[in-house]
A protein has these predicted regions:
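Alpha-helical cap/lid subdomain in secreted, periplasmic
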Residues: 61, 224-386
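A structural signal for short, well-ordered beta-strand segments and their strand-loop junctions
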Residues: 66, 210-213, 281
Length: 386
């Protein structure tokens, strides 16, 4: 596949970069947002990861392969976005080499590429510098629909995507949702990018999910800069938005009044960007240290403050994070903060109940078995109880 074919295959991204060497990568944020995240080395790195991005493909072969490069960040990349826009970035990305200085360490790499077939096969490979291949069952050599999910970490690029059969970009266009949040939204510790809560929720709703989670982040109205283009009427406009901040605010913000001010400014900016678009605001989920005192107040006080600030806008639906039944360390990959795949599954199911069908009259009350089949479409939901 050529660069333009890769670009047309991509889903859940806002920027596409291709170097003279043919390596292509996908960016989840606007240039304005990347300027904000670029002020901190950790946020800069995490914002450049391709979390949630996948390629939609069709092949009658049974093998897929490509050249992969795991890239750290170019020191000139963020200034170029700020000063030159995407054209400047495309110039800088040309000839990008493997050895690029990294400003801050990424989390330990565990995440993989996932190739998911339309009959439920999932084949995973760790990203590395070199050639990757995926083999899957397709004995009848039918035209099989595939999704190649990019890893949550690190920042990767690929070229020479090939199959041993005919290979084309997928043509299906799905409605889009926008997922805003921290590391839990980004998908920390999921291992399989197709099994984060955002990917699972998108499958349940029959949509694509632009994942704008950034690990360690918090309520910051500036992080919404540059989304005006996404907010305009058209296919890029999200059908709904999810917002899931608060756990880092509880750790970092010096006082509850400051948190309220930041959340208030954030929700005001969000409402101004997406009038008429429902926003599902997930208050912080359970964590293993929620009983410890913090300068910002108790965990319950923070959750209540977020719910109250979100409630100022009629388009916001508040979902109580503590109502999600993962209040046990067995649902957490790190034993206390970041859910594992089962934890993410439960999160997605419960959020689907909050968003979804009329039979979930009390969002959060349905159990994991009471979930509509994937691809059921994007239903209209009433506000979640506060």
């Amino acid at each position: 596949m050529t660069g333009p074919e890769l670009e047309s295959s991509g889903r859940n991204y806002l920027g596409f970069l291709e170097g003279d060497d043919g390596y292509c990568s996908f960016i989840r944020f606007t240039g304005e947002q990347l300027r904000v995240y670029g002020e901190d080395p950790l946020f800069r790195n995490l914002s450049m990861c391709s979390s949630g991005v996948y390629l939609s493909l069709v092949t009658d072969g049974d093998r897929l392969s490509f050249d992969c490069r795991t890239l750290e960040l170019v020191s000139q990349l963020l200034p170029a976005i700020a000063e030159l826009g995407w054209d400047g970035v495309k110039e800088i990305i040309r000839g990008l080499s493997k050895k690029i200085e990294q400003g801050a360490p990424l989390p330990r790499q565990r995440e993989k590429f996932d190739l998911v077939t339309d009959d439920g096969q999932r084949i995973s490979r760790m990203p590395k510098n070199g050639h990757l291949y995926f083999e899957f069952r397709n004995g009848s050599r039918r035209a099989m629909k595939l999704r190649l999910y990019f890893p949550v970490f690190p920042y990767v690029a690929l070229r020479r995507l090939e199959s041993n059969g005919r290979l084309e970009p997928g043509t299906a266009t799905l409605p889009r949702i926008l997922c805003l949040g921290d590391s839990i939204t980004q998908g920390f510790n999921a291992v399989h990018p197709s099994l984060t809560w955002t990917s699972r929720l998108a499958d349940l709703l029959g949509v694509d999910a632009l994942n704008q989670g950034v690990g360690g982040y918090y309520f910051d109205a500036a992080s919404l800069e540059g989304l005006e283009g996404l907010a305009r009427e058209g296919p890029s406009r999200p059908a709904l938005v999810t917002v899931a901040y608060g756990t880092n605010d509880w750790d970092l913000v010096p006082g509850l009044s400051t948190l309220r001010e930041r959340a208030r400014a954030y929700f005001a900016r969000l409402a101004g960007l997406f009038p008429g678009v429902p926003a599902y605001v997930l208050t912080p989920i359970w964590r293993g240290d929620l009983d410890k005192p913090k300068a910002c107040g108790s965990f319950d006080e923070v959750a209540r403050a977020i719910a109250e600030e979100a409630g100022r806008y009629p388009g916001n639906r508040v979902v109580d994070g503590l109502s999600i039944p993962i209040q046990d360390r067995k649902y957490f990959q790190d034993n206390w903060l970041h859910p594992n795949e089962e934890g993410f599954r439960i999160m997605a199911d419960r959020l689907f109940c909050a968003i979804g069908p009329a039979r979930a009259a009390e969002p959060g009350s349905c159990d994991g078995s009471d979930v509509a089949s994937p691809g059921s479409g994007l239903p209209v939901a009433a506000p979640a109880p506060r």
